[in-house]
């Protein structure tokens, strides 16, 4: 429709003037030859965008006060519509009727050529080891990013962590992986910031640089909790009530420090560390930025193929989780206490131990009674960091330490663990008959 045709379709007052109504404003936005299709609601940023070029310069697509003033001037000049509130409401309605998600649109536009690239990307650009672990971690991260876009708020609790020297290209890799610079952010420095949602809003991949490496014991638990969160409850300035904002982003970590992970014997399962070596990279990621971006487009096309054609599990495989647990030890501070206990057990003649025995003999506290937190720490070390020993749940009698739960040396080959026999370290396991006589439950 031409401007004249649109003007002729507007409702009039009894006096024949164009009515200043929301309906008339809406008709203009939906049919004017310049404004038709120009105003859309961006689901990613939760803001209104102007998505086609108009007659003034705009640095970004997001509708701002200046844009609104230009639109008011145009409606006043061409249609005699002057009610600011009604124009504002009409903009809100027309935008809501034309929602779009730029990342979904981008991902849905991609076509994979059948060549694997995710498997080799970190080796190609950052010199990471070419391994199944490297491949699975990057693929998981990309599939999590896709799922978060198509199903905001879905459960995704892992952070891909790139570890290596300064200037290796870690941050650049995350930035280019986000496709557009406005979909990437490295501005999240504190997770207790009142404006944390606003710093995440509109971004797809958020880099947390060195945050984990500088965290203390309390803040690392806060970081774990933060990564696991599926939403933020937040009130933007122009709203009356807080609302749940489902997450559409994923988090990447980068560190120049090798032992960046906290000492956590129960496992840092949320953090997927990958060591990078810039000197081993086949191509520097900024050597030909256009070529790197084209390569990354095809990585996302590959990830979308997997997303649509195979069941998506946003966790590592069981085998890879075992490898992760071993690998993570390289990125944690040395566990000196676990080392002392392992050395003691490797030279220990007995086949069964309890936490009190470990405290007294391995940690050299023969005359002290362990505190509860020390018992918990020993249990954590024995259950997570010690090799060659397995826990037993039925309490057994220890000569010096009474009736205790503990651990027994893992049997070698098909040799069964000894039961009911006198052991060289001064204790023996009770038989069921002896336990019944002593009224000890098994």
Residue ranges and their predicted role:
Residues 1-116, 132, 136, 368-369, ...:
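N-terminal nucleic-acid engagement/recognition segments and initiation subdomains in replication
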Residues 91-201, 205, 356, 363:
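P-loop NTPase catalytic core of nucleic-acid-dependent motor ATPases
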Residues 196-201, 236-254:
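AAA+/SF3 P-loop NTPase mechanochemical coupling elements
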Residues 205-227, 261-267:
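Conserved AAA+/SF3 P-loop NTPase catalytic/coupling segment centered on the Walker-B
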Residues 220-243:
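Conserved catalytic/switch belt of AAA+ P-loop NTPases
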Residues 263-281:
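A short helix-turn-beta junction within AAA+ P-loop NTPase domains corresponding to the substrate/partner-engaging
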Residues 306-350:
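Conserved alpha/beta core segments of nucleic-acid transaction machinery
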Residues 361-369:
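Short helix-coil junctions and helix-kink-helix linkers
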């Amino acid at each position: 429709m031409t401007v004249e045709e649109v003007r002729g379709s507007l409702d009039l007052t009894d006096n024949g003037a164009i009515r200043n109504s929301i309906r008339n404003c809406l008709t203009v936005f939906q049919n004017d030859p310049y404004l038709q299709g120009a105003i859309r609601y961006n689901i990613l940023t939760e803001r209104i965008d102007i998505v086609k070029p108009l007659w003034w310069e705009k640095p970004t697509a997001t509708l701002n006060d200046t844009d609104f003033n230009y639109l008011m001037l145009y409606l006043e000049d061409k249609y005699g519509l002057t009610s600011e509130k009604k124009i504002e409401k009409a903009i809100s309605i027309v935008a809501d009727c034309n929602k779009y998600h730029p990342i979904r649109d981008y991902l849905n536009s991609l076509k994979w050529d059948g060549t694997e690239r995710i498997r080799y990307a970190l080796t190609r650009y950052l010199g990471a080891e070419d391994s199944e672990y490297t491949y699975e971690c990057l693929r998981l991260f990309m599939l999590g990013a896709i799922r978060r876009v198509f199903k905001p708020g879905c459960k995704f609790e892992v952070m891909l962590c790139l570890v290596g020297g300064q200037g290796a290209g870690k941050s650049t890799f995350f930035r280019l992986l986000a496709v557009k610079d406005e979909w990437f952010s490295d501005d999240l420095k504190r997770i207790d910031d009142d404006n944390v949602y606003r710093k995440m809003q509109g971004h797809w991949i958020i880099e947390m640089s060195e945050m984990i490496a500088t965290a203390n014991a309390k803040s690392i638990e806060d970081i774990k909790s933060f990564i696991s969160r599926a939403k933020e409850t937040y009130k933007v300035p122009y709203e009356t009530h807080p609302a749940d904002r489902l997450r559409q982003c994923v988090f990447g970590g980068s560190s120049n420090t090798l032992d960046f992970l906290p000492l956590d014997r129960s496992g840092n399962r949320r953090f997927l560390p990958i060591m990078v070596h810039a000197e081993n990279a086949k191509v520097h990621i900024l050597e030909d930025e256009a070529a790197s971006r084209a390569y990354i487009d095809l990585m996302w096309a590959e990830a979308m193929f997997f997303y649509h054609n195979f069941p998506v599990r946003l966790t590592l495989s069981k085998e890879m989780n075992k490898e992760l647990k071993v690998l993570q030890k390289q990125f944690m501070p040395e566990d000196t206490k676990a080392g002392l206990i392992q050395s003691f057990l490797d030279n220990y003649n007995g086949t069964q131990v309890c936490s009190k025995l470990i405290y007294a003999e391995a940690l050299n506290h023969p005359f002290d009674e362990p505190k509860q937190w020390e018992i918990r720490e020993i249990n954590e070390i024995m259950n997570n960091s010690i090799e060659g020993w397995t826990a037993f749940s039925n309490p057994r009698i220890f000569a010096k330490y009474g009736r205790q739960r503990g651990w027994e040396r893992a049997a070698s080959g098909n040799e069964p663990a000894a039961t009911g026999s006198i052991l060289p370290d001064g204790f023996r396991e009770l038989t069921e008959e002896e336990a019944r006589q002593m009224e000890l439950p098994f």
